[in-house]
Amino acid sequence: MSSFFKSFAGNPREAAAMAMVQSSSYRVLSGKSCSNLRRNTPLDSFLAKGRSSVKAFSFLYVSRFSTEPNNEFGHSSKRRSRGPVMAAKKASEGEKQEDGKYKQTVDLPKTGFGMRANSLTREPELQKLWEENQVFKRVSDNNNGGSFILHDGPPYANGDLHMGHALNKILKDIINRYKLLQNYKVQYVPGWDCHGLPIELKVLQSLDQEVRKELTPLKLRAKAAKFAKATVKTQMESFKRFGVWADWNNPYLTLDPEYEAAQIEVFGQMALKGYIYRGRKPVHWSPSSRTALAEAELEYPEGHISKSIYAIFKLVGGAKTSLLDEFIPNIYLAVWTTTPWTMPANAAVAVNAKLQYSVVEVQSFSEDESTVTSNKKKIPGKVLKNQQKLFVIVATDLVPALEAKWGVKLSISKTFLGSDLENCRYTHPIDNRDCPVVIGGDYITTESGTGLVHTAPGHGQEDYATGLKYGLPLVSPVDDEGKFTEEAGQFRGLSVLGEGNTAVVSYLDENMSLVMEESYAHKYPYDWRTKKPTIFRATEQWFASVEGFRTATMDAINNVKWVPHQAVNRISAMTSSRSDWCISRQRTWGVPIPAFYHVKTKEPLMNEETINHVKSIISQKGSDAWWYMSVEDLLPEKYRDKAADYEKGTDTMDVWFDSGSSWAGVLGKREGLSFPADVYLEGTDQHRGWFQSSLLTSIATQGKAPYSAVITHGFVLDEKGMKMSKSLGNVVDPRLVIEGGKNSKDAPAYGADVMRLWVSSVDYTGDVLIGPQILRQMSDIYRKLRGTLRYLLGNLHDWRVDNAVPYQDLPIIDQHALFQLENVVKNIQECYENYQFFKIFQIIQRFTIVDLSNFYFDIAKDRLYTGGTSSFTRRSCQTVLSTHLLSILRVIAPIVPHLAEDVWQNLPFEYRNEDGSAAEFVFELKWPTLNEQWLSFPAEDVLFWQRLLELRTEVNKVLELARNEKMIGSSLEAKVYLHTADAGMAAKLLEMSEAKNEADTLQRIFITSQVEVLSSMEKEMISSVQHTGEYVEGENKVWIGVSRAEGSKCERCWNYSGQVGSFSDHPTLCGRCFSVIVANPPEPAVAAVNSLA
């Protein structure tokens, strides 16, 4: 017998108690100095076991984290005084454990890491720390795992940031930070789109009318550049405040000379390959902006109402009119249009050759039936009230619908195919021109209208295509302001979208050509900046022909990874059906199209020499040179003697050509970057915008896509799924989310990490919601996550890596905890790789906040606080806690980097990477290496622990019953009885109840003072138990009983034990606490620092 135990030989009761203590697992470990931290420490050996394949059942519990939100294991019912020592919790009769004489022997948590985030001050402090130490560059430069390039789509430099910007930039930052932890060299160059109408309008709106009149192109450009640069600076500071890491000192701006030169180069390459041409054809035209627009510059708001009409044109003859001779001169072609103002430009009527058409006699008009139908205002034309005989040609299938629409009886007189009408002639309803009937395409259907289409090649894409086929005149009597020109005769000077439209309808009615006028609600294109309607108008423009490389583009699309996968369908449909791209704009603020025009013939001069010369000038002087330099200076040497014969073009390039050239201006020019990029990530609207313009320019010039993967996100809506609008008062401002508003109660300052947590929580592949309630929820989750990390820090205040307990020596509960952790990390890594951040959020929330806090942390408090500072069970628990802290920090760091860094800066122990390198900042850590030994936790034990945790939940239910009946207060006042007919389960439970390793005992897992496993159900014993319960587990019932715990309450750990009173020097202690006190006598009281609950 050792001298330690011999000292109790004179007291048999004390000797017996000490014999029990001797057999316990709470042995004292000798302390080790960590002043000289070695590379191969015990913790290093413990952590670094190598990458492994997944063992059987390795995902058993992780699936419950990530896919079964209401079925988390280890989730217990609510209990008061849950832990063995709850220093800051309530005790009966005002008792506080730390007020006793043994308070200095209790290892309470200590940390300088506060519960409150103080984001307003702490986050900027951390950002300053990162910036001063160039952490982003430092980590990227030191990584050696290859490069990763997420190419930034440039936002417009024309206003404050909104939640869409926040969603976009934070998603990018999460990806970049994850790749840093994966040992990649991350190159992220932020960009801004600085040209175009949006910025030009902002400048013009800020000027007085008189100042606008005096603006020269160069003065306007100077003001636009100044505005754009100022906005870039403001937006950049906001992005930094979001916690976004980027090369902020070297962003790319589309107004930079080197970028503009690269754009000119792309244009030149396309032109030299024959993909750029100039022609007169209908394009989207904005009268409010006085410029052509691309498809990506249009929007289709709800609620647009057009004035649609049914009109008739008098048939006068033609190739096959013999079959219609009997109806002449009272036969007409009936057409329907939603743009009556295009009637002056009518050049033909198109039919579908394969459809059946009928001559119908119009009879029995009833004015009472023509007022209002289905909330659509209908006004009949005078021709319907005319008593003369009237025959019209319409598609046969539409006769019933037109009868109802017009309020008439239509009697079919003759039926024939549309092909029979080709080359028939009719009289133009306004200027009496002789016009043909032509065969159109599949766009002519019987879904609406009359089956005959009014065709104006100068005002529609399909009409234009039909006009080319038949050589129809390209008439477009509309000017830049959207007003009729002199070519429109009596309508000249009238706005086609206003009084001009009304005037045309009135003229048709007065001349007996209007059958019906009707209000028609439909999608109609608006200028996305001025929010006003656009028109189709034929003008001289520069186009990029897509047809020459459409097949190559479609092939490239199929070789790109699209997230979500269905996005490939959208961009494929848009690309396969898109018309030629109108790339010229009639604005001043942009990159010029480098074309010179002959003064007399207007023929353009643009070849390899002229383009390269202009590119060279712009690369040095910027695109302003086009406006201030003479034609002679802008032309190459060999053309200067002809300079007087040419003038500079005034068109600028579409801003989508600007941003669509970024792969050339950035990826192809910046050191450290390469083409193609790994990822493009933008909103879903960019399928017809940046994704497509980048793809087209790249395929046309390089023959391949500029990206390997494309990720798209939805729009940000309010909590009710409504679009945000100032008028509705539902706008969420990212600045106010971070910094708070004037009323801190209504608009609290949440900080950037709460906003980032929200970004990770939503399934961004669709539209996402945000609002006050959602932000409060995110703040609550953040607070709980912070509390979990604070618990870990506090309980590792005296931890050193040399204290690590080898895996094989750990209690089973600790080995199980590491098995769970490894599967969580493995699952999270898979989610990061697949960009499924919302699943990561779910896993982190359930694992750290629910399962760790409610199970492992709950039962760990006993051995952490009272097991003895250097005891085996405390050190084994700290081994697990330190591993959890190091892993959790790394998996959450991409999402909440400020929190992760704040924790790291408060780390109470020194830690080095496996290669021996120090980690001054959290992102200097490497991603956790999967540990084969931890993942190989035996499958049968995995299943047993699942059953045990379910049993724990049922035990808590019975404890709650006992508590409600006032039999117990704390669960430590209880003794639990168990019985199951499952012999294997019973043996396992009995083994645990008698475990020498006290950490694995049932009473510690249930947080009760005693647990007894019954081999049989004796009536006498069962009747003495006050509260019982049972549940079905498999094919067997498990019986649970609860009674008052035996023995007295230990003053130090609050467990009930028959040993209390056995030690004369310490009569209020149980045997375990007595052994700890004897081995580690209490020191004089020292004030605890930042004690945790």
Curated annotation (Swiss-Prot):
Motif 'HIGH' region positions after renumbering to this chain: 155-165
Binding positions for ATP per the UniProt entry: 726
One Pfam family per UniProt: zf-FPG_IleRS
Enzyme class: ligase
Stretches the record annotates as Disordered: 69-103
Binding locations of Zn(2+): 1050, 1053, 1070, 1073
Catalytic activity from the UniProt record: tRNA(Ile) + L-isoleucine + ATP = L-isoleucyl-tRNA(Ile) + AMP + diphosphate
Principal localisation: plastid
Motif 'KMSKS' region per UniProt: ranges: 723-727
Xref: SUPFAM superfamilies: Anticodon-binding domain of a subclass of class I aminoacyl-tRNA synthetases, Nucleotidylyl transferase, ValRS/IleRS/LeuRS editing domain
PANTHER family: ISOLEUCINE--TRNA LIGASE, MITOCHONDRIAL (PTHR42765:SF1), SOLEUCYL-TRNA SYNTHETASE (PTHR42765)
Protein name, as recorded: Isoleucine--tRNA ligase, chloroplastic/mitochondrial
